[in-house]
Amino acid sequence: MNSRREVSISKCLQGFFSEEGTLSKSLPSYEFRPEQLAMATAVARAIETERILLLEAGTGVGKSLAYLAPAIIHAIQEEKHIYIGTGTKTLQHQLMEKELPFLKRYLESSFSYALCVGSENYVCERRLGGGAFPGQEDLFPNPDEISQLRAWAQTCRQGLRSELDFPCSPQTWHQICRVPELCAGQKCPKGGDCFYQRARARIARATVRVGNHHLLFADLQSDWEYLPPRIS
């Protein structure tokens, strides 16, 4: 794919979705769907003309790829970031685990993507270790859960609650998750090892940022508390 608008988004999509395009040549089971290409082209035109677009499509059209592909092509060409908002966490994870890896493989262009969730979804190792309130570790509601969480925090990938493979009560998680009011920021002894700060760095670098509608509007109201500034 050429960059910097040497080729229009619509032409790139034609070369990707059409009966003679990249997907058809790469995937023996690929079935060309005119509705999918039409939807993707409509999204591309809306992006190129900076207009708002509302679309509705039936089951089996391939809606996710139809709006993701033109948005990603635009982001790559213009060296911008895009935020994909969803209504459910299920769709968030579907995009992260299925559609985006698929597009990264077959769009023939390099881009990165990251999941955006509220900061309360991340464990705070300082709070988990008792560092937020030294000498008050006995305030933890369930010592057994805390022991499990401390062991888990040593091996988990991103420090997300969704990564837990054992039950954790809401009360316990509330005691050890990241909350803005108790975050030590630059003074935190965890520094660059903080799960939340590492996630913010990944999101800042990502071409595609996937979150939900609630997080986006919460960020707008709180002056970009959760996401890095400037979603474009």
Task: Enumerate the language-model features and the residues they cover.
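Flexible, glycine/threonine-enriched loop-and-boundary segments that flank and lead into catalytic domains
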Residues: F217-D223
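Short, surface-exposed connector motifs at secondary-structure boundaries
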Residues: T49-L53, Q77-Y83
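A substrate-engagement module of RecA-like helicase motors
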Residues: M1-S26, E79-T207, H214-F217
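Walker A/P-loop NTP-binding motif
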Residues: A44-R45, L65-E78, K98-F102
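Walker A/P-loop
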Residues: T49-P70
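Conserved pre-motif I regulatory segment
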Residues: R4-L55
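SF2 helicase catalytic motif II
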Residues: P229-S232
